[in-house]
UniProtKB/Swiss-Prot annotation:
Protein name: Lipid-A-disaccharide synthase
Chain segments annotated as transmembrane: none
Enzyme Commission code: 2.4.1.182
UniProt cross-references to CDD domains, sorted A to Z: Glycosyltransferase_GTB-type
Family per similarity comment: Belongs to the LpxB family.
Domain of life from the UniProt record: Bacteria
Any GO CC annotation of this UniProt entry: membrane
UniProt-listed InterPro entries: Glyco_trans_19
Described purpose of this protein according to its UniProt entry: Condensation of UDP-2,3-diacylglucosamine and 2,3-diacylglucosamine-1-phosphate to form lipid A disaccharide, a precursor of lipid A, a phosphorylated glycolipid that anchors the lipopolysaccharide to the outer membrane of the cell.
Keyword Lipid metabolism set for record: yes
């Protein structure tokens, strides 16, 4: 370990990275309170003492049109960071997510003799697997949230450390379902279904009608069924309300602004789009069905690019179909409702599933902030 105070360079490109960066800085300061942190940081990282050469919002652009509009600025920032980090010679550079920006930067810094870490593996195990070779050239170490990610990197001899998942650390093994119900105004004994049609406009457009029709079918069987629908922002809420007015105008439900985790915790089952929400739902111990639909050409292309047997993280973690995945033409109200029925019923199917959810939760609950900090410090030796 260097005798001088550590200097650690970091680049975070979005809110999730800011949260991870702040947790990492906190854990590092416990071991090295005099360490210096510099780079691209959001408000949480800055509140932990990171000196921001650029604000995180400069990198937080999504979509091809937005990226093209900001390309000159993004390239300038990357060149400037390369120059300034090379002059600074930090003990280690940590690129937090934002792979399109960070992996190239990591490669340039590694060429200058600076140790580099990429924190949060891109989904190379699922598609565009050849990216693993670029990552291997650019980084000294990848920090992975999930055990199957490390197994993938091991196949290609790319140094990778499984650190557990921060979300698993944040959520209790045994959730407080009744506290979530009190917060949402749901009766303690009510039967409750959560609908989560996604966070993107295209997802809400493609999934909402089928999800609403599924809820109507289930309400015919369970007339007292409570339905909660968390929506990530006012735009998605307005979009969902417009679809509901056409498809299920008279179906009673609780529309929530945000509160996705509370909805999962409070519900007996959930119908959701794939993605991080499926992992969060597993950690909330809420049985789920994954439904997903996309434009036909996009689905055709995805089937040829994606190299995994499953799309949802619970199934990838379990290595088998733990939760039903009804994709594209299978994503139909009758089939979705049939898959949800045994999850709403209190019985052995549900109990076995919840026990497996708890086992998987333990497998990825490793205190990720401390594990990440330990990996950073080992590389500084």
């Amino acid at each position: 370990m260097p005798k001088h105070p550590l200097t650690i360079a970091l680049v975070a490109g979005e809110t999730s990275g800011d949260i991870l960066g702040a947790g990492l800085i906190r854990a590092l300061k416990e071991k090295h309170p005099d360490a210096r942190f510099v780079g691209v940081a959001g408000p949480l990282m800055q509140s932990e003492g990171c000196e921001a050469w650029y604000e995180m919002e400069e990198l937080a652009v999504m979509g091809i049109v937005e990226v093209l509009g900001r390309l000159r600025r993004l390239l300038h920032i990357r060149r400037d960071l390369t120059r300034r980090f090379t002059a600074l010679k930090p003990d280690v550079f940590v690129g937090i997510d934002a792979p399109d920006f960070n992996i190239t930067l990591e490669g340039r810094l590694k060429q200058q003799g600076i140790r580099t870490i990429h924190y949060v593996s891109p989904s190379v195990w699922a598609w565009r697997q050849k990216r693993v070779f670029k990552i291997g050239r650019a980084t000294d170490l990848v920090l992975a949230f999930l055990p199957f990610e490390k197994a993938f990197y091991d196949r290609f001899n790319v140094p990778c450390r499984f650190i557990g998942h921060t979300m698993a650390d944040a959520m209790p093994i045994v959730p407080d379902k009744q506290a979530a119900r009190r917060e949402l105004g749901i009766a303690p004994q009510a039967l409750c279904l959560a609908l989560l049609p996604g966070s993107r406009s295209a997802e809400v457009e493609m999934l909402s009608a089928d999800f609403l029709k599924t809820a109507m079918l289930l309400r015919e069987k369970y007339p007292q069924l409570e339905i909660v629908v968390p929506l990530v922002n006012p735009r998605r809420r307005a979009q969902f309300e417009a679809i509901k007015a056409e498809v299920a105008a008279d179906l009673p439900m609780h529309l929530l602004d945000g509160k996705g985790r509370e909805a999962m915790l409070a519900s007996d089952a959930a119908l959701l789009a794939s993605g991080t929400a499926a992992l969060e739902c597993m950690l909330a111990k809420c049985p789920m069905v994954v439904g997903y639909r996309m434009k036909p050409f996009t689905f055709w292309l995805a089937k040829r690019l994606v190299k995994t047997d499953y799309v949802s993280l619970p199934n990838l973690l379990a290595g088998r179909e733990l939760v039903p995945e009804l994709l594209q033409d299978e994503c139909q109200p009758q089939r979705l409702a049939a898959a949800l029925e045994p999850l709403l019923a209190q019985g052995e199917t549900r109990d076995t599933l919840l026990a497996t959810f708890a086992e998987l939760h333990h497998q990825i609950r490793w205190n990720a902030d401390e594990q990440a900090a330990a990996a950073v410090l080992e590389l500084c030796r």
